[in-house]
Structure formats: structure tokens, C-alpha cells
Regions:
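Detector for C-terminal structural segments
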Residues: 38-42, 202, 206, 211, ...
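Alpha-helical secondary-structure segments
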Residues: 42, 117-124, 154-158, 194-195, ...
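N-terminal lobe/hinge region of extracytoplasmic solute-binding protein
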Residues: 44-95, 126, 191-192
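A structural "hinge/loop" feature
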Residues: 47-64, 87-88, 114, 136-137, ...
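Gly/Pro-rich hinge or "lid" segments in bacterial periplasmic/extracellular proteins
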Residues: 82, 163, 168-222, 226-228, ...
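Aromatic- and charge-enriched surface segment that lines or borders ligand/interaction sites
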Residues: 89-134, 150, 156, 289
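Surface-exposed binding/hinge segments that line
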Residues: 103, 137-179, 200
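Ligand-site clamp/hinge motif
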Residues: 184, 214-260, 378, 387
Length: 509
């Protein structure tokens, strides 16, 4: 459910009436500069992306700058989480689910002038699925056996096995189309087909995008001439930049405790919407004592999720008991599987051979929700005799190296942002080091059907397995906290996929 909070009207701006202007001897041919519609936007983000190509790295900040602004896909995902055509205007799926035929838009050009056609679409998908691919979602493309391009407007994917989520996956940032001649430079100078072109990047400060005057889809052309993404990590500085007018919007405001500070502001409005941000404390299940399910269950039962939400995010959040959000089809409430129960948690630890508890370290990235959640958990674990040390870990560089690459950790905490990503527990390797053949079988089975009811039932079984086996401690779903100028129109209030989609954004003067 979305809560909308609005405040008092903006300051009244007086304008000369036409009659008064004429009586003063003025000739009016257009809007005066003071009245001209504003066409620039200064938008804040907490985390600066490490690069600008979402097809080569996973951090969500990349897509929050470039997805649907610079880059587009064969299909896209709208604000309601629904699949919509984009660079593919239509598609057909064979009865056996093994052949996907896409009809592509015509007259589309990349920002470097190169034509988008079936050949460049094939290049993009081959690059994503090839042996040398570093695509963060390479598994999306694993079932593509071959690709044909009968003509410039037709792309045919031949699959080795039915893949029920393929169309949905093709709408993700990792699946965008890239220009063959410039793809290698996409990390620093991205080139796509979108309504905005990359203009500049002053690292440590800002990224600037400029309107693409030659954008192919005139119905969705950008209304803004320039967008500047400003990177501000400190929540107090974020609030100050908004109140001073240095920023027009902060769609992912990082300090829930400061939301009330905007009450009564004549210029700004706040929004609270939905996201896919699942805050989980993942354990390295290949290490003792986390290789014992009883220990993991004990830690889960030592946690009062409501207290975590209150302490970490000012009570704004939804408790979860598995790796799934209430926004997603097939959701089941699993918070009652391992409920808060200190005595039961102590008994499980004793049964596992740790009657006096144990000591371990959690690696916590700097994003506000992580250390705050960790501190609340630390106090709760102490009640069952477990000592948790908190090690601040810079995100993304050190966190990715320690957790994702080296697996050098006991526990970590992070918000998984991708929608319907429960299948990450079937990945091998992945940072949980989790091995569960029955779970893996469910993830394979769910791709063998495109029937929503069947998929939802399978996802329900998968949620239950994770709720009982707890390879991660499932805490809460973060809301989307937005603060922006009330004259801004078109910013997404809900976030079915991490993004700042700006083609529909304009100023209502």
C-alpha cells in the first residue's frame, strides 16, 4: 500500500495579465524567462555507481542512472511491474516453448548513429551469454542455444529448454541492448537507444545526461533537456540539499527518521511506496557453525523483526520470512515459520552443541539500513549467548571482493533489489554457498511452465523451504522513500525494479 503525504501549496507567483502588459506597451511573443517551463532536473542518489553499463556489473546504482534513460531492452517493465514491448514491438512463442520470434522496431538508432536491428540485438544477447560474458545475470541467457536473424527486423531465439521467465528477464537492466561498435566502452561512456544520451561523469560528484533529440519513440520522448545525478551519501546532507533547492528530487531518500522534517515544507512532497528491496542477513553456510541448520534457525528465532524495523528504519518496512516480497505473485507469509522465541532459540543452540553460544563477525556495508539493522541484531543475539562483532565493509568494491568473490565472511547484510530473485539460492557458486537439491529442482521446474498458477504454486513451495532452512535471516522489505519538488510530475512512486525512469518526468509550472 502506498501512503501519500502532501503539504501546503507552493508560493504564489504573480504574473502580469495580458491587458496590463499591453497597456504598459509591451509586445508579448512568448513566455517570459521567469515563466518558461523548467527543463532541467537535479536528482540525488546515495550511492555512486562503479560504472554505467548494467550488462557487466550488478550494483543497482548502475541501472538507477542508465536503465530506460540511456539503455533500453527488447521489452521493458512498467511501474506496475508488467512487461511491455520496447525495442521489440511484438513476439511469438512456439507451442513447445522453445522458439521465441521477435519483430523489432524500425528506424531506431543508437546514440553513436549505428542502426539498431536484428544483428545488433543478436550481438547484445551473444555478448551476454558468451563464454567470456561477465553479465551479472548471465543465467538469464543460459537456455538460449542459438540465435537467428532472418532479416533486419526479425530476431529468433532457439532454446535448449523451456524458460518461463525469459520474457520477464529480457526486461531487466542486465538485458539491455548495446551498440556493437562502442559496447567495450560502456562502463564509462554508455551508448544506448534511450531518450537520454550520456553527457559527462565527474567521479565522486555527478553524472549528467542530455535529451536525445533523435529518439525513435516520439510518444515517449524526454521532456527534460538535462538531468544531473548528484551522489550524496550522508542523509543529513541529502536533506539539506533538498531543503536548499540544490536538489529537486531524492527518489531513494536514505533516512526515514528525517522524513518528518519535511512536514510543512512549501516546496517539497514526500512519497512512501513499494520496492523489491529484501533486507537479509546472509550466512556462509559452508562454514561452521552456519553449516548447521539448527544454528541458523536459532539465530532467526532470536530476532524480533518488528524491533529491527523500528530500530533500523523508523518502523517503515514489511516483515518477511523468506526471500520474497508481498508485491510478487505467489507470495506466502512465512514469518510464522520461525517466529521470535528466545527460549526456543537457546534450546536449538544447545541441541547443535553450542549451549554457551559462539562468536562471529558480520560484514556490514555502509548503507544506513545495514549497520542499523546489525546493531539491533547484535543486542538480540546477546540474549541467547551469541556475540556478533560488526565489521564495516565498504560497498560495493570491498563488499563484492570479500563476499561475492572470496567468500571471506561469516555473515553479511544487504538489501537484494531484484524482483523475483528467489532463484539465487540455486546458483552455484553464490555467496551463501547454499546447497539444496530439492530447492534447485523447484527452480528448474518453475521455468518449464508459463502458466501463472503453476508457477505461483512452485514459488510457494520454494518460499517454505527457505523459511525452514534459513540460509539467510529474512528481515524486512524496505519501502521506497521519495522526497521531491511538488511541481515535478512523472517520477515513479513504486519501484518494481531499481530505477529512475525519467522519460515521462516534467515540471508542472
Amino acid at each position: 500500500m502506498m501512503i501519500t503525504l502532501s503539504f501546503a501549496p507552493s508560493r504564489f507567483v504573480r504574473r502580469l495579465s495580458l491587458g496590463a502588459a499591453l497597456s504598459a506597451g509591451l509586445v508579448i511573443t512568448a513566455m517570459t524567462p521567469a515563466e518558461a517551463a523548467k527543463t532541467t532536473l537535479n536528482l540525488g542518489m546515495s550511492v555512486e555507481p562503479t560504472g554505467l553499463d548494467p550488462t557487466i556489473a550488478a550494483p543497482v546504482a548502475i541501472g538507477q542512472v542508465t536503465w530506460q534513460n540511456v539503455f533500453e531492452g527488447l521489452v521493458t517493465i512498467d511501474q506496475a511491474g508488467k512487461i511491455q514491448p520496447q525495442l521489440a514491438k511484438s513476439w511469438e512463442i512456439s507451442a513447445d516453448g522453445l522458439t521465441y520470434t521477435f519483430k523489432l522496431q524500425t528506424g531506431v538508432k543508437f546514440h553513436d548513429g549505428e542502426a539498431f536491428d536484428a544483428a545488433s540485438a543478436k550481438f547484445s544477447l551473444d555478448r551476454a551469454r558468451g563464454a567470456e560474458s561477465v553479465n551479472p545475470q548471465k543465467r538469464f541467457f543460459a537456455s538460449i542455444a542459438s540465435i537467428d536473424t532472418p532479416d533486419a527486423e526479425t530476431l529468433v531465439l532457439h532454446l535448449s529448454a523451456p524458460t518461463g521467465s525469459l520474457i520477464y528477464w529480457l526486461g531487466w537492466p542486465a538485458s539491455v541492448m548495446v551498440a556493437p561498435k562502442t559496447a567495450a566502452d560502456g562502463k564509462t561512456t554508455p551508448v544506448g537507444t534511450g531518450p537520454f544520451k550520456f553527457a559527462s561523469w565527474a567521479k565522486g560528484d555527478k553524472v549528467e545526461l542530455a535529451r536525445n533529440a533523435d529518439y525513435w519513440n516520439k510518444d515517449a520522448a524526454a521532456k527534460l533537456d538535462k538531468v544531473t545525478f548528484r551522489f550524496i551519501a550522508d542523509p543529513q546532507a541529502q536533506a539539506a540539499a533538498l531543503k536548499s533547492g540544490d536538489l529537486d528530487a531524492f527518489p531513494e531518500f536514505a533516512a526515514p527518521e528525517l522524513m518528518s522534517s519535511f512536514d510543512g515544507d512549501a516546496r517539497l512532497v514526500t512519497r512512501i511506496g513499494n520496492t523489491e528491496l529484501k533486507v537479509v542477513a546472509g550466512m556462509n553456510t559452508a562454514k561452521k557453525p552456519f553449516d548447521d541448520k539448527r544454528v541458523r534457525q536459532a539465530l532467526m528465532m532470536a530476532i524480533d523483526r518488528k524491533t529491527v524495523i523500528d530500530g533500523a528504519w523508523s518502523g517503515l518496512g514489511t516483515p518477511i520470512g523468506s526471500h520474497y516480497t508481498p508485491n510478487d505473485p505467489g507470495y506466502r507469509d512465512m514469518t510464522g515459520v520461525l517466529p521470535y522465541d528466545v527460549e526456543k532459540a537457546k534450546a536449538l543452540l544447545a541441541e547443535a552443541g553450542y549451549p554457551n553460544g559462539f562468536t562471529f563477525t558480520i560484514k556490514s556495508p555502509q548503507m544506513a539500513y545495514a549497520p542499523r539493522s546489525a546493531q539491533v541484531m547484535q543486542a538480540m543475539f546477546a540474549e541467547i549467548g551469541v556475540t556478533m562483532n560488526i565489521e564495516p565493509t565498504e560497498f560495493p568494491a570491498k563488499w563484492v571482493q570479500d563476499i561475492m568473490k572470496d567468500r571471506n565472511f561469516d555473515m553479511t547484510i544487504v538489501a537484494h533489489a531484484e524482483p523475483l530473485d528467489i532463484d539465487i539460492y540455486a546458483r552455484d557458486p553464490y555467496y551463501f554457498n547454499y546447497k539444496n537439491p530439492p530447492f534447485n529442482a523447484l527452480m528448474k521446474k518453475v521455468q518449464e511452465t508459463v502458466d501463472p498458477a503453476t508457477q505461483n504454486a512452485i514459488y510457494g513451495e520454494a518460499q517454505k523451504i527457505l523459511a525452514e532452512d534459513v540460509p539467510a535471516l529474512y528481515l524486512f522489505v524496505m519501502p521506497k522513500l521519495g522526497v521531491w519538488d511538488k511541481k515535478l510530475k512523472g517520477l515513479w512512486e513504486n519501484e518494481p525494479i531499481p530505477s529512475n525512469v525519467l522519460s515521462g518526468v516534467s515540471w508542472d509550472e
